[in-house]
Amino acid sequence: MQYILGIDFGLKRIGTALVNTIDRFPSPFRVFAVQNNLQQAVNTLFKDLKQAGYELVQIVIGFPHFHYQSSIQVSIHKFVELIKTRFNVPVTLIDESGTTSEVKANLQELGLKNRTFKKAKDTLAATLILERFLNQQKPN
């Protein structure tokens, strides 16, 4: 089965989610520590996906849209180049504005505590990034 990988990039952690191209229901995958080494994070992600047997056809990465160039944007561009080299699949950047706030609001609405938010925010934000991407792909 073929999958699309969603990524919520952070300087400390990278949240990931997957959706298969048939069912199209995104679900959280896992969080990867960056530890100041993007190449190692990309290699670990590649290894884990390969071991789990996921065949990727696309990667979608959340990208913050500011009116100025920020350090996080520079880091994401470096990350994208590493991802493209390692995975050899199309990479799409998608606006991630408000994903973390939306995740927090959804968890609070469910009555879950901030501790749950801290543990789940990265993978759930990646899930939202995938949902936004899939919604953009729907024909009008």
Curated annotation (Swiss-Prot):
UniProt xrefs under InterPro entries: RNaseH-like_sf, YqgF, YqgF/RNaseH-like_dom, YqgF/RNaseH-like_dom_sf
Q: State the EC number(s).
A: 3.1.-.-
**Which CDD domains does this entry report, sorted A to Z?**
YqgF (cd16964)
Q: Which Gene3D superfamilies has this protein been placed in?
A: YqgF/RNase H-like domain
Picking any one GO molecular function of the record gives: nuclease activity
Primary location: cytoplasm
SUPFAM superfamilies per the UniProt record, alphabetical: Ribonuclease H-like
Name the job this protein performs: Could be a nuclease involved in processing of the 5'-end of pre-16S rRNA.
This chain belongs to the protein called Putative pre-16S rRNA nuclease
Species the sequence originates in: Mycoplasma pneumoniae (strain ATCC 29342 / M129 / Subtype 1)
